[in-house]
Amino acid sequence: MSDGTGVPAAAALPPAASHRAQLRAEVLDGLKITFPFMVGAAPFGVIFGALATAQGLHPLETASLSLFVFSGSAQFVAISLLALGAGGWTIWLATLILNLRHTLYAAALVPYVRHLSLPWRFVLSAGLTDETFAAMEDRYRRLGKHELSHWAYLTSVVSMYLNWNFWTALGIFAGSQVKGLE
């Protein structure tokens, strides 16, 4: 017998179980759509960690850049400008201009996150990268938004953040083992 949805009544999940199943599906899909970007970012994280320490940044400074800036392109620009002897304001302005593209990314995603609370929007915007934008914009375009779709977005953000910082740490370690990287 069906409950009117086409799903046999015996197979229908209770609301809480259905919610958990949908949440799990969102998290898994967030990982699935982000994984190719994680693979692509890995060598750049290693290179950044190795080059930054080779340029004279302390390993904690290098790790802090990845932890708090979390913008590979800005981080590479920053270490390049540091190597050239640029001042702090020059580095700040260059990385700000470079990252202005994120305002366009954010504007494109507003229709999908507008309904979320301010704390949710803050966390998602703080983790907005080229990769998370590409993954989520494509997903939202294909599937639209629904009650739990922001969990796929959060999974994309967290997985890219952890991925970038893991590979940066590996690069810091590897860079300390290889001489002549300057």
Outline where the language-model segments fall.
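Helix-loop-helix hairpins and the membrane-proximal interhelical loops
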Residues: 1-69, 80-95
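Helix-loop-helix junctions within the multi-pass membrane cores of secondary transporters/permeases
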Residues: 19, 93-181
